[in-house]
Curated annotation (Swiss-Prot):
Keyword Endoplasmic reticulum: no
Protein name stated in the entry: Ferroptosis suppressor protein 1
Residues carrying the site annotation 4-hydroxy-2-nonenal adduction: H174
Enzyme class label: oxidoreductase
Lipid modification (N-myristoyl glycine), residues: G2
Regions crossing the membrane: 7-27
Provenance organism: Bos taurus
Gene behind this protein: AIFM2
Length: 373
């Protein structure tokens, strides 16, 4: 797939909705193959959100996590919010009235969640970076911090704070007994707990925050009283919420209402085509594939979608996507981590080398063919 594809220039035009990990992987491959495409995103920069939590605690790190789309994709990038997909006329409609025609559509809308783990809003690169620098200030000014949610984002957030500021009091509150993602090996989840305890994180497990809606989030206060359903009360200066990830279905919900899974993801076949549409693909978090929602998987999906657009043009057999054994690395601060590769446990040294030190930031700059700041 390294060489350019010869074809009738007017026959194929791909629109990619969403410039996350799957979207930029697909766009980069189409660009290399000289296949006409447009990438649409409401931000002007790709957000390497794998490193969002470190950008919340380490001043100066955020600028490494936002990478301009237009520098890489030039006139093939449009900043805008998708408001409708017109299946009959094969166009993507933007909020500003632009209509983008497509022969093939790749939906890569990702998922949405609370800041700082996610940054999903219409924004410039400068504003986005400043939002994270402001968050660093809130963390620096707080002595006692509560992290709500003990999935992968919550445990990584707690670890990042204690790594950067070991003197701060950090309490992690999680509604279940086991930490991190349910798909992980029990020994990996246990090691996550051990790492947090070694770092001095206070754990409140099998407890749910009962007054969450009344709490100020991401804002330093003199005293915030966090209450749980077990009657525990924690005094904090800062509350950071790391749960509630949802599929970003707003762009396509009205067009594909009958093709949606219960969580809002699009039902796809083994070729990652949306059920009933051979020219429309869903990749990444918005594809209903039985595997954890991860940047790594989104990039694998992009490979399949682009290969199948090329294969369909050349009347070749389509490539199938089969989820493999789980590879999942948890960076617990820059010097620690744990995870599994192809279903096998890997410890601190391997995870530190593979992910924890720079959180794969350099990989995204390479994908975007730019040099990091």
């Amino acid at each position: 797939m390294g060489s350019q594809v010869s074809m009738d220039a007017g026959a194929v035009h791909v629109v990619i909705v969403g410039g996350g990990f799957g979207g930029i992987a697909a766009a980069s491959q189409l660009q290399a193959l000289n296949i006409p495409f447009v990438l649409v995103d409401m931000k002007d920069s790709f957000h390497h959100n794998v490193a969002a939590l470190r950008a919340s605690v380490e001043s100066g790190f955020a600028k490494k996590t936002f990478i301009s789309y237009s520098v890489t994709f030039k006139e093939n990038f449009r900043q805008g919010l998708v408001v409708e997909i017109d299946l009959k006329n094969q166009t993507v409609l933007l909020e500003d009235g632009q209509a983008l025609p497509f022969s093939h559509l790749i939906l890569a809308t990702g998922s949405t969640g609370l800041f700082p783990g996610k940054f999903n809003q219409v924004s410039s690169q400068q504003m986005a970076i400043q939002a994270y620098e402001d968050m660093v200030t809130q963390v620096q000014r707080s002595q006692s911090i509560v992290v709500v949610g003990g999935g992968s984002a919550g445990v990584e957030m707690a670890a990042e704070i204690k790594t950067e500021y070991p003197e701060k009091e950090v309490t992690l509150i999680h509604s279940k007994m086991a930490l991190a993602d349910t798909e992980l090996l029990p020994c990996v989840r246990q090691e996550v707990k051990e790492i947090l305890l070694r770092k001095g994180v206070q754990l409140l497990l099998s407890e749910r925050v009962s007054n969450l809606e009344a709490l100020p989030v991401n804002e330093r206060r003199e005293c915030i009283k966090v209450q749980t359903d077990k009657g525990t009360e924690v005094d904090a200066n800062l509350v950071i919420v790391c749960n509630g990830i949802k599929i970003n279905s707003a762009a396509y919900r009205s067009a594909f209402g009958d093709r949606l899974a219960s969580n809002g993801a699009l039902r796809v076949n083994e070729y990652l085509q949306v059920e009933g549409y051979s020219h429309i693909y869903a990749i990444g978090d918005c594809a209903d594939v039985r595997e954890p929602k991860m940047a790594y998987h989104a990039s694998l999906h992009a490979n399949v979608a682009v290969a199948n657009i090329v294969n369909s043009m050349k009347q070749r057999p389509l490539k199938t996507y089969k989820p493999g054994s789980l590879t999942f690395l948890l960076a617990m601060g820059r010097n620690d981590g744990v995870g599994q590769i192809s279903g096998f446990y890997v410890g601190r040294l391997m995870v530190r080398l593979a992910k924890s030190r720079d959180l794969l930031v350099s990989t995204s700059w390479k994908t975007m063919k730019q040099s990091p700041p």
